[in-house]
Amino acid sequence: MDYLAAYLDHLAHERGLSPLTCENYGRDIRTLQQLAGEITLQNLKTAHIRRFIATLHGRGIGGKSIARMLSAWRGFFAFLSRRHGIDNNPCVGMRPPKSAKTLPQALSPEQASKLVDISDDDTLAVRDHAMLELFYSSGLRLAELVSLNVDGLDLAEGTVTVTGKGNKTRIVPVGRHAIEALQTWLPERTLLKTADEAALFIGRTGKRLTPRAVQYRLKTWAIKQGIAGNVHPHILRHSFATHVLQSSGDLRAVQEMLGHANISTTQVYTHLDFQHLAKVYDQAHPRAKKNKS
């Protein structure tokens, strides 16, 4: 039996995880299978898992990535125990090597505005303008953006209904610039779409955009707009959270808009906010200015 296929089906249809999340789980569990080689799932021991972790660490894979893999493996074995009678979970109690904590990368407000300020009137550029404005305006995850349907938009109210992790829905505000960009895109979309396509963002074929297509378009626009560094979809979500928190100081509101189940996940942005405050302090306070030497 293909246990991995059964587990991925369970994640998609019973737990309601996004295709992108399921793909990531699949990749992590295939890594386990490759490391295990001829050792069966029933015969894997804690010592094997410890050796696999050391191997991954030796390849330069960070503690955060290994922690994610361990979590995926642990969940896989728990599923096998519940559904298929394989009562073996060699990952219980295993911990990944510690890695240095890194804060989410965010663009400055000026960089974010420059990135999304697309003035080209080509159909795909019009779409990309609406897509990036909405990304930044509403702090969406990549999987949430590509899964949006037209009927989730309420431009009159200035909101979008989003299906997030665990199939949970939330209503998120949409900013004025994003509304204007979407109003320009919707008539263009009508000319491209296939008869039964409900997706808000579609490609030349009239079908829903894939996550990879969005990643590629974002990187292309970052280069065109002169934004340096690794610009990826999540950076717009980080930028949204950081900039809203800097302006409002309302952590709970940011938590709601991001769709975080736990406020501790949102609290990382308070560290980014402190970095901003510290920079302002260093530049503005007369007793903070460093002597030039």
Task: Tell me what each language-model feature is.
Residues 1-293:
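Conserved catalytic core of the tyrosine transesterase superfamily
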